[in-house]
Amino acid sequence: MENTNFLNSKIFFPTDWQDYELIDFGNNKKLERFGKYIFIRPDNQAICEPYLSRKFWKNADGEFSSEINSDKGNWKFYNQIPEFWDIKYNTLNIKSLPTPFRHLGFFPEQSVHWKWCRDLI
């Protein structure tokens, strides 16, 4: 019997972010705001051209660079960044910090799951 549960799937979009924003994406990178800091991180799915000008991207506080198809790389900071800082999502407080694997301590796209879990508890 064929499983057709995907036809009844729901798609959720995060709407409760105060401290995260996907600002722009393109050329295999994304420009994101985490609290008051703006970062450039690699993203292989960002294959289009960025919407914003290169000048705008140059305002980033830091950038992660890595070898092609590698998650590990290095951060280069253009402005002073603390070791970690607080990010708010709805009623949650999250510690954000740059990791050697391009992440900043959490995955913003998973926030709909956090909200779903919170609503169940």
Predicted regions and their residues:
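Conserved alpha-helix/loop element of class I SAM-dependent methyltransferases that forms part
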Residues: 108-121
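Non-catalytic substrate-recognition/targeting regions of SAM-dependent transferases
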Residues: 18-35, 39-105
